């Protein structure tokens, strides 16, 4: 295997969107074209019992929302594609943000009837901060939606990124006729036996169809006043190519995939803590853990650490360093994924995502290196939780299952664990309410441990250096706790309590996460 050639073939990207924009459906269609599934099962299949391939966890199947990041790999057009389907629900932004650290590009799915929605904007900010390319898919043209020019304007005004339409819709909803493909200079037809037609045939095909006349006017306007196409600007994350289509009817998706693979970047390097970039073509293997998932196979109660390979080649059975602990590990049981199905990996290269079976060795953010390399990559973002619950086992006889479940789910990074400094009582912290619901559901379903949860409301959280801590600083308005790494942390009742503390202890430095 020529490693350099293999790395050049890799395209690793995440799909981001607001809930219900059609993200899971387009993921299904991409897998369909990659030959990984025989038919695309959409989220709407909830009533029929056919579930989306990428929504594999029980609670996702029940609700039709993605609450964890699935990793899927397929080959298409000479490229090895690693697609990461991220959680669409805002409560799971932590998991999504970490996933966005492991990709080289993003596909942003937008509901053409709704335009840019809140979650899309939040996720776009993370992508923009990383400076990776964004490819936009305006979805649901099979339904009536907003004017294409309005959608482009909103994209530029709200997200602050220039856009270039790669195609343009001819009608929409019941009047949808197809796409005017500006990039490939052809027509893509929605109805009839022929998939494509030349632009010259447009007048003959559509006659005096008012929608086609409107398209010609719009394109003339775009040619005069629109942005110029620039591959350089796309790769710099300054220009987003915009594709229109319908994931549900699988229209425009294949053209999107082919064009995306043409322009999406090959694997990037990754920054170490000293600021130096590790090049993907470095011969030495390196990677980082961006996600840990327990119970991907409920029959085996397993844990998988998802690793983005940054450089070199992984070979089964290789020994790696874990600089955080100063210890080593052997990577013998390693898989690659198609949502819930997986296969053992013999080798993989920079850009690939591999799953390492984990018995509690790894944590989110860990760096893996080989040989004399003991460096660490820059830390992944961590988040300050906003709402808290006290949690305990409902049945004292189930304490062992309760502790195992809490330990594993916390290590996934899906929820944060704190202990009352004095009593040792468990408290959970989350970004949003849904995280608590998923935690409770999984504790009962996967660990057979019912839990009692009592709301503590919103808290303002700040970390304090152990050397600055005096337990007498704690009061009814600022409870003292330890995080899962035994670092002291204050849970302030509100901003007023925080300001009061800061005034009383001006020399004490309080730290806030993202």
Curated annotation (Swiss-Prot):
Record localization: Cytoplasm
UniProt binding sites for GTP: 17-24, 85-89, 139-142
GO molecular function, one term: translation release factor activity, codon specific
Alphabetized PROSITE patterns for the sequence: G_TR_1, G_TR_2
Keyword Cytoplasm: yes
Any single biological process term in GO: regulation of translational termination
CC terms in the record's Gene Ontology section: cytosol
Residues annotated as domain tr-type G: 8-268
Coiled coil: none
Chief location bin: cytoplasm
UniProtKB keywords: Cytoplasm, GTP-binding, Nucleotide-binding, Protein biosynthesis
The protein's role, per its UniProt record: Increases the formation of ribosomal termination complexes and stimulates activities of RF-1 and RF-2. It binds guanine nucleotides and has strong preference for UGA stop codons. It may interact directly with the ribosome. The stimulation of RF-1 and RF-2 is significantly reduced by GTP and GDP, but not by GMP.
UniProt record similarity statement: Belongs to the TRAFAC class translation factor GTPase superfamily. Classic translation factor GTPase family. PrfC subfamily.
Name of the protein in question: Peptide chain release factor 3
Organism: Streptococcus pneumoniae serotype 19F (strain G54)
UniProt lineage: Bacteria, Bacillati, Bacillota, Bacilli, Lactobacillales
Gene: prfC
């Amino acid at each position: 295997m020529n490693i350099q050639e293999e790395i050049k073939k890799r395209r690793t990207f995440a799909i981001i969107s607001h809930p219900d924009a059609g993200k899971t459906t387009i993921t299904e269609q991409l897998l369909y074209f990659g030959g990984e599934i025989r038919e695309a099962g959409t989220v709407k299949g909830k009533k029929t019992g056919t579930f989306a391939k990428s929504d594999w966890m029980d609670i996702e199947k029940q609700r039709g929302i993605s609450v964890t990041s699935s990793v899927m790999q397929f080959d298409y057009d000479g490229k090895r594609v690693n697609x990461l389907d991220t959680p669409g629900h805002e409560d799971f932004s932590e998991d999504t943000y970490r996933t966005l650290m492991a990709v080289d590009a993003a596909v942003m799915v937008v509901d053409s009837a709704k335009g840019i929605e809140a979650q899309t904007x939040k996720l776009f900010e993370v992508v923009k901060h990383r400076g990776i390319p964004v490819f936009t898919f305006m979805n649901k043209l099979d339904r009536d939606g907003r004017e294409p020019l309005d959608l482009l304007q909103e994209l530029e005004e709200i997200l602050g990124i220039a856009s270039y339409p790669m195609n343009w819709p001819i009608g929409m909803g019941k009047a949808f006729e197809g796409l005017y493909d500006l990039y490939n200079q052809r027509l893509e037809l929605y109805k009839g036996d022929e998939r494509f037609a030349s632009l010259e045939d447009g007048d003959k095909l559509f006659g005096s169809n008012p929608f086609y006349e409107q398209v010609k006017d719009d394109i003339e306007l775009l040619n005069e006043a629109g942005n110029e196409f620039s591959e350089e600007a796309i790769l710099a994350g300054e220009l987003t190519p915009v594709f229109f289509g319908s994931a549900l009817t699988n229209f425009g998706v294949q053209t999107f995939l082919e064009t995306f693979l043409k322009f999406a970047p090959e694997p990037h390097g990754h920054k170490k803590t000293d600021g130096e970039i590790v090049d993907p073509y470095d011969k030495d293997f390196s990677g980082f853990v961006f996600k840990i998932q327990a119970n991907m196979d409920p029959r085996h109660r397993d844990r998988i650490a998802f690793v983005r390979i940054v450089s070199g080649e992984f070979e089964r059975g290789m020994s790696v360093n874990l600089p955080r602990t100063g210890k080593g590990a052997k990577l013998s049981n390693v898989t690659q994924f198609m949502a819930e199905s997986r296969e053992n990996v013999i080798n993989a290269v920079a850009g690939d995502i591999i799953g390492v079976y984990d018995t509690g060795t790894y944590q989110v953010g860990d760096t893996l290196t080989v040989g004399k390399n003991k460096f660490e990559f820059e830390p992944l973002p961590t988040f300050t939780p906003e709402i808290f619950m006290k949690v305990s086992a409902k049945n004292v006889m189930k304490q062992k299952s309760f502790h195992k479940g809490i330990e594993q789910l916390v290590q996934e990074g899906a929820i944060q664990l704190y202990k009352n400094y004095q009593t040792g009582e468990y408290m959970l912290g989350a970004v949003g309410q849904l995280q608590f619901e998923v935690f409770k559901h999984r504790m009962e379903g996967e660990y057979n441990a019912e839990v009692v949860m009592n709301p503590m409301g919103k808290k303002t959280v700040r970390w304090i250096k152990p050397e600055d801590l005096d337990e007498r600083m704690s009061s009814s308005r600022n409870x003292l706790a330890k995080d899962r790494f035994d670092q002291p942390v204050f849970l302030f009742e509100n901003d007023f309590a925080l300001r009061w503390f800061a005034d009383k202890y001006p020399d004490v430095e309080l730290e806030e996460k993202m």
